[in-house]
From Swiss-Prot:
Monomer. Optimum temperature is 95 degrees Celsius. Is highly thermostable, retaining 85% activity after incubation for 9 hours at 90 degrees Celsius and 88% activity after 1 hour at 95 degrees Celsius. InterPro entries: Glyco_hydro_1, Glyco_hydro_1_AS, Glyco_hydro_1_beta-glucosidase, Glyco_hydro_1_N_CS, Glycoside_hydrolase_SF. One of its GO terms (biological process) is cellulose catabolic process. It is an enzyme of class 3 (hydrolase). The gene is gghA. Activated by glucose up to 200 mM when p-nitrophenyl-beta-glucoside is used as the substrate. This activation by end product concentrations may be due to a transglycosylation activity of the enzyme. GO terms for molecular function: glucan 1,4-beta-glucosidase activity. Keywords: Carbohydrate metabolism, Cellulose degradation, Glycosidase, Hydrolase, Polysaccharide degradation. This is 1,4-beta-D-glucan glucohydrolase.
Length: 444
């Protein structure tokens, strides 16, 4: 039996644009994901978040499912344009009402809310002013954060400033695969810097407004292994770790400087006097959230812009084509403790997409997802034994949902959503996870 510590928080996670639908209802403004998904060619099959899981209308049923599974915590995000349709200025009371109902219902059921302030749905009106590339966004984000802290901070004590800022900056502004769909390396690295400035200002406002809460930030992580013991391959893996994983942001937050290999590559793309902001960026945070899905083998490649390329391995993969490397979650957890020693750590997302089908009996037998989750939770347990101050684990995701540029083609839920009828079916993995929570650990 692999028992977890007393009070360990087992949770499920979602994000606003991925599940809510009704993006313009009740006075909400447009987000960049609304405009991006409505532009032909950006999202597979022309899918949009117009309906998604219709959580905007079915939130009560969805919270009942969380309760049925027995999750102790629910991580969800707030849609910025629901609260501030123009991004700043006038507050939309109906947006506040929607999230107030969710928060109050969770608390009635003894489910701890974890709120993500920004999970990628920037108000479109702010994108028209340059979005994350505009230095002023740090103040816009602080203003938005203040509205949330003042309205919800009396009841919500766990806050996340940003979800996966690397994805916001790089996938949205360098690869152009996510909103706002830009491909400009200067804009991308100015965005990295402005995300850090915005995060720091939000933390500062939090300290003034929410006296007894905790605030942190969430990063995407892959486990990068070198293809050989050659020095240049090891360096390639180190670069990818610094650039793709938590160090890109935690090094500034804890040490006031970007990681060495990132600076070597990107110094010319950062704002000219970026150092002047570093003191302000060094705000103490209460926890670090880590998302983990996959591992990658990398090698030195003189022909690639960053001198790195991926080496495909003969490993099992998920429906996303991501290699399944459970021990990677252990090494990421160990790494963050050794490199930055945060007070508390959470796994804020871990999960997998598979091609789920509903059986004739109306069940979803997703043994592959159970195997994936079990293997990763075992490694998480191992990290706790080795002294990582891990306080909770969140499965991505509660529901099948809008998987960004992949649209509805990829299912990550432990609950199946039939998008034609909006019927929810708890998958075998949902029942399995419910048992893990009940036992506070793995029995087999």
């Amino acid at each position: 039996m692999k028992k977890f510590p007393e009070g360990f928080l087992w949770g499920v996670a979602t994000a606003s644009y991925q599940i809510e639908g009704s993006p313009l209802a009740d006075g909400a403004g447009m987000s960049i994901w609304h405009t991006f998904s409505h532009t032909p060619g950006n999202v597979k099959n022309g899918d949009t978040g117009d309906v998604a899981c219709d959580h905007y209308n079915r939130w009560k049923e969805d919270i009942e499912i969380i309760e049925k599974i027995g999750a102790k915590a629910y991580r969800f995000s707030i849609s910025w344009p629901r609260i501030l349709p123009e991004g700043t200025g006038k507050v939309n009371q109906k947006g506040l009402d929607f999230y107030n109902r969710i928060i109050d219902t969770l608390l009635e059921k003894n489910i701890t809310p974890f709120i993500t302030i920004y999970h990628w749905d920037l108000p479109f009106s702010l994108q028209l002013k340059g979005g994350w590339a505009n230095r002023d966004i740090a103040d816009w984000f602080a203003e938005y954060s203040r509205v949330l802290f003042e309205n919800f901070g009396d009841r919500v004590k766990h806050w996340i400033t940003l979800n996966e800022p690397w994805v916001v900056a790089i996938v949205g502004h360098l690869y152009g695969v996510h909103a706002p769909g830009m491909k400009d390396i200067y804009v991308a690295f100015h965005t990295v810097h402005n995300l850090l400035r915005a995060h720091a200002k939000s933390v500062k406002v939090f300290r003034e407004t929410v006296k007894d809460g905790k605030i942190g930030i969430v990063f995407n992580n892959g486990y990068f292994e070198p293809a050989s013991e050659r020095e240049e391959d090891i360096r390639a893996a180190r670069f990818m770790h610094q650039f793709n994983n938590y160090p890109l942001f935690l090094n500034p937050i804890y040490r006031g400087e970007y990681p060495d290999l990132v600076l070597e590559f990107a110094r010319e793309y950062l704002p000219r006097n970026y150092e002047d902001d570093m003191e302000e960026i060094k705000q103490e945070i209460d926890f670090v959230g880590l998302n983990y899905y996959s591992g990658h083998m990398v090698k030195y490649d003189p022909n690639s812009p960053a001198r790195v390329s991926f080496v495909e391995r003969n490993l099992p993969k998920t429906a996303m084509g991501w290699e399944i490397v459970p021990e990677g979650i252990y090494w990421i957890l160990k790494g963050v403790k050794e490199e930055y020693n945060p007070q508390e750590v959470y796994i804020t997302e871990n999960g997998a997409a598979f091609d789920d089908v509903v059986s004739e009996g109306g069940k979803v037998h997703d043994q592959n997802r159970i195997d994936y989750l079990r293997a990763h939770i075992e490694q998480v347990w191992r990290a706790i034994q080795d002294g990582v101050p891990l306080k909770g684990y969140f499965v991505w995701s509660l529901l099948d949902n809008f998987e960004w540029a992949e649209g509805y083609s990829k299912r990550f839920g432990i609950v199946y959503v039939d998008y034609n009828t909006q019927k929810r079916i708890i998958k075998d993995s949902g029942y399995w996870y419910s048992n893990v929570i009940k036992n506070n650990g793995l029995t087999d």
